[in-house]
Design a protein with these regions (language model features):
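Helix-to-loop junction immediately C-terminal to a conserved catalytic motif
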Residues: 73
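A short, proline-enriched helix->beta-strand linker immediately N-terminal to the Walker B motif
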Residues: 173-177
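Walker A (P-loop) phosphate-binding loop of ABC-type ATPase nucleotide-binding domains
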Residues: 60-64
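ABC transporter nucleotide-binding domain
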Residues: 197-290
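Conserved ABC ATPase "signature" region
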Residues: 16, 20, 121, 125, ...
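Catalytic Walker B motif of ABC-type/P-loop ATPase nucleotide-binding domains
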Residues: 179-183
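Conserved ABC transporter NBD signature motif
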Residues: 81-92, 96-97
């Protein structure tokens, strides 16, 4: 049964979030251990997810992505705000979330003792499928993802990428209209990643399945997302298509310089660049106007600095550049080290 508020959802809306806030209280330190300060994990978050799209939540560690997802899936009650999924108020009725979505979290240890086959079948049974249909869906999903040869192996004995793919398989059994995937391709090789996104695309085309994807892999985000909300400090600081977001920094070029051992700071032009560069070990990253970028490349490749240069790249802006341009607090960027 839909809630009264849910009747106001647009026809193409699957998820509606309004004013969602969650604060973790401060924890006092014990026996000399430092305490933990109060954390505003989500701060008045508002967003909509449309039917059939892959909607991304992008941000660095601590941005509030996983806390937001736990509230979307009914696993964590917010302090304030609304979450409606297909017309259901999952703040007031969190038990309904399991009937309308499949959630793949970062950790899925509950299935570790089961074989790949039994994990998929059991998940289907828990989602209300009768035995014959659960087994049929299990077999189809394992074949689709290339997991049939591993069907009899316990998840705990698989490699990290294989285990992650097996857990993704369980999310597909039962054909939920909404998939909430928290970094689903972590540890996977390129073949497995392609299998994941092919499976997602197939369900979008055939069933109108909607996906909420948590990631801080900007390369993956730019490839698979229809729209993306950029989070920082628990707030949504931007929401648009990847192309729309990158338009905000269209007048910049990213220059990356990698030095062989250390930057030749005795070269005046290099010393001057250091003030504008983000340094990470031997790598310097600069975000410059196109004319400046060309001048920098000419300087380091045509002068005394060239002997110290190991590599350089000149690239158009990425979503990470957008995040930094918007004032994101994690100055080292979005991608996991």
């Amino acid at each position: 049964m839909s809630t009264r508020a849910g009747q106001d959802l647009r026809d193409d809306e699957v998820v509606r979030v309004r004013g969602l806030s969650k604060t973790y209280p401060a924890v006092r330190g014990r026996r000399g251990a430092p305490g933990v300060p109060e954390v505003r994990a989500t701060d008045a978050v508002e967003l909509d997810v449309r039917r059939g799209e892959v909607f991304g939540l992008l941000g660095p560690n601590g941005a509030g992505k996983s806390t937001l997802v736990r509230q979307l899936t009914g696993l964590l009650r917010p302090d304030a705000g609304q979450v409606e999924i297909l017309g259901h108020d999952v703040v007031r009725h969190p038990e309904r979330a399991a009937r309308i979505l499949a959630y793949l979290g970062q950790e899925s240890t509950a299935l570790d003792e089961l074989t790949v086959s039994l994990a998929a079948e059991t998940t289907g049974r828990l989602r209300g499928l009768e035995v014959r249909r659960a087994r049929a869906e299990r077999d189809a999903v394992l074949e689709e993802l290339g997991l049939t040869p591993l069907a009899g192996r316990p998840l705990k004995k698989l490699s990290g990428g294989q285990r992650r793919l097996a857990c993704f398989a369980t999310a597909l059994v039962g054909e939920r209209p909404l998939l909430v995937l928290d970094e689903p391709t972590t540890g996977m090789d390129p073949v497995a990643r392609r299998a994941v996104w092919a499976a997602v695309d197939r369900r979008r085309a055939e069933r109108g399945t909607t996906v909420v994807l948590v990631t801080h892999n900007v390369i993956e985000a730019e490839t698979v997302l229809d729209r993306v909300a950029v989070l920082d400090g628990g707030r949504v600081i931007a929401c648009d298509t990847p192309a729309g977001l990158k338009e905000r920094v269209a007048d910049e070029v990213r220059v990356e310089l990698v030095w062989r051992e250390q930057a030749p700071l005795e070269v005046p032009e290099v010393a001057a660049l250091r003030e504008r560069a983000a340094e990470s070990g031997r790598r310097w990253t600069l975000r410059l106007a196109p004319e400046e970028a060309r001048a920098v490349v000419a300087t380091v490749t045509g002068g005394a600095a060239f002997a110290a240069l190991d590599d350089f790249t000149l690239a158009t802006p990425s979503l990470e550049d957008v995040y930094l341009a918007l004032g994101g607090a994690a100055r080292q960027g979005l991608v996991k080290a």
